């Protein structure tokens, strides 16, 4: 069909609607199909925004030689949609049209060769409406066609859609501004002071936003359009070198820096914590106040020093808990628990970490670290917390010198008293309890050694093994006759340290 169905502009230009703006959609198809057009009454807004909504990412369904006009005399601010009933492709316009001022947005889609055009007209109440802008999509590019024949454009792909915003329309000087946003509201390019129906400078790097499929009419939330201001700046390292591909985030708005380390985002008025982050660098956060004007916020990121800090007692003993902290992370939330360049072992001379055990884990997972106490190695598994560190590795069954079977009979034998009276490990509890109560003061005072650590021990020699097998009766007899002192061989050790043998007769 070749006959165009349009509504005369003369019918619009009546006294009743002289100051009323209207929305005009010109959609072009190869066949005549009805449209669903639904203006949103009383939705508020402050700008003119057009979203082109080819859900399937191609322009092939649109054809030339047939046009339709759908008009409304009640163009409240808000969201509008037009969709062919037999097609899933939808055109959306969000406009600031009210009963007093604004431009008409006319959408004219044509595609016989994968081409499309989006027309913006001003003064719908006038028979002499001017064309504000002619945005076209052709062979993978979005361009702006000017009345002087110049042809400039934006490089795009069909993977995503963009939002075109025509704003700040100045009828007196016949100027307007245009800006292109991605689906998150980040500015992809802009031009200020464009002449009506004149060429617009090119903008690069725009991806088209592909809306969710499954519905013929996309559901844009109506509501007040929030004025946004541009926040831009540069991200460098501490030497001032630009950092490309750094992430800059403020609330849910995020972008990455270009090759020059520059970024730009749009934010509504308010207070924000804006953060710059890049792998292997410490994030930097600044608080800013957005109040309707452009702001510049620069960042300087320092390299993360991959250091391990160990804080513990003088020596390692079995079942000891040692705080273990690794400060190394990046913006993806992964933590390297072993790739460090410096070990700080504060007074932990017999403890070392196996640096060859490289492990890269995400937060919340378990990290396995090899820990060596003296000459023996154990593997310790701990949780990588969301606070970016691994903490409190419990060293289970670390062999010590002397061996662990010589575990202390008295704990804290360093001040003349056995601090743990309930002996464990060798002999029954009752034997050791009685042994401790009776001879504690004698042995402790005789063999106290001032250099013994709090965790040092006293291990009896031959007599101890005899007591294990002959039982409580012989112990009582030996205590009663006082003959045990000459038989006791006492080994006193420092935790993980050398053994000292003391013979008393």
UniProtKB/Swiss-Prot annotation:
Any one GO molecular-function label of the UniProt entry: metallocarboxypeptidase activity
Keywords (A to Z) from UniProt: Virion
Subcellular location field: Virion
GO CC annotations on file: extracellular space; virion component
InterPro entries attached to this UniProt entry: CarboxyPept-like_regulatory (IPR008969), Peptidase_M14_domain (IPR050753)
Pfam family, one: CarboxypepD_reg
UniProt keyword Nuclease, yes or no: no
Main location as per UniProt: virion
GO biological process, alphabetically ordered: peptide metabolic process; protein processing
Hydrophobic: annotated span: 20-40, 423-443, 470-490
UniProt xrefs under PANTHER family: CARBOXYPEPTIDASE D, B, PROTEASE M14 CARBOXYPEPTIDASE
Miscellaneous information on this protein: The virion does not contain any lipid membrane.
Protein's UniProt name: Structural protein 27
Organism per entry: His1 virus (isolate Australia/Victoria)
């Amino acid at each position: 069909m070749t006959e165009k169905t349009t509504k005369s502009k003369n019918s619009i230009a009546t006294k009743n609607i002289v100051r009323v703006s209207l929305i005009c959609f010109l959609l072009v198809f190869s066949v005549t199909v009805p449209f669903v057009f639904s203006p949103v009454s009383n939705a508020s807004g402050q700008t003119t925004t057009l979203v082109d909504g080819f859900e399937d990412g191609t322009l092939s369904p649109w054809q030339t030689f047939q046009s339709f006009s759908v008009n409304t005399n009640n163009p409240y601010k808000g969201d509008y949609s037009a969709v062919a009933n037999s097609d899933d492709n939808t055109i959306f316009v969000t406009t600031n049209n009210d009963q007093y001022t604004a431009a008409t947005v006319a959408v004219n889609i044509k595609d016989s060769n994968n081409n499309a055009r989006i027309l913006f007209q001003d003064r719908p109440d006038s028979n002499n409406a001017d064309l504000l802008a002619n945005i076209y999509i052709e062979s993978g590019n979005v361009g702006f066609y000017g009345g002087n024949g110049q042809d400039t454009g934006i490089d795009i792909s069909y993977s995503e859609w963009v939002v075109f915003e025509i704003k700040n329309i100045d009828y007196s000087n016949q100027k307007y501004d245009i800006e292109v946003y991605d689906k998150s509201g980040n500015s992809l390019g802009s031009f200020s002071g464009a002449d009506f129906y004149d060429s617009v400078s090119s903008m690069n790097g725009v991806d088209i936003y592909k809306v969710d499929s499954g519905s013929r009419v996309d559901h844009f939330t109506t509501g007040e359009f929030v004025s946004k201001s541009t926040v831009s700046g540069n991200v460098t390292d501490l030497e001032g070198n630009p950092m490309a591909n750094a992430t800059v985030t403020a609330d849910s708005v995020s972008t990455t820096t270009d090759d020059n380390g520059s970024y730009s985002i749009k934010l509504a008025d308010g207070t924000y914590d804006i953060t710059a982050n890049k792998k292997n660098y410490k994030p930097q956060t600044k608080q800013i106040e957005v109040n309707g004007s452009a702001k510049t916020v620069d960042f300087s990121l320092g390299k993360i020093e991959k250091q391990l800090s160990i804080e513990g007692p003088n020596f390692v003993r079995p079942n000891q808990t040692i705080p273990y902290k690794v400060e190394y992370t990046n913006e993806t939330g992964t933590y390297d628990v072993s790739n460090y360049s410096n070990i700080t072992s504060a007074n932990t001379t017999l403890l070392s970490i196996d640096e060859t055990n490289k492990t890269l884990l995400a937060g919340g997972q378990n990290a396995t670290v090899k820990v060596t106490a003296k000459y023996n190695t154990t593997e310790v598994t701990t949780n990588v917390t969301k606070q970016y560190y691994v903490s409190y590795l419990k060293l289970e069954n670390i062999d010590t010198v002397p061996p662990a079977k010589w575990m202390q009979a008295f704990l804290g034998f360093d001040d003349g008293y056995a601090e743990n009276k309930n002996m464990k490990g060798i002999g029954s509890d009752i034997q050791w309890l009685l042994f401790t109560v009776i001879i504690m003061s004698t042995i402790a005072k005789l063999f106290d050694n001032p250099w013994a650590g709090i965790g040092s021990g006293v291990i009896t020699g031959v007599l101890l093994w005899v007591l294990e097998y002959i039982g409580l009766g012989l112990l009582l007899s030996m205590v009663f006759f006082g003959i045990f002192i000459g038989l006791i061989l006492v080994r006193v050790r420092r935790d993980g340290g050398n053994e000292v043998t003391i013979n008393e007769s």
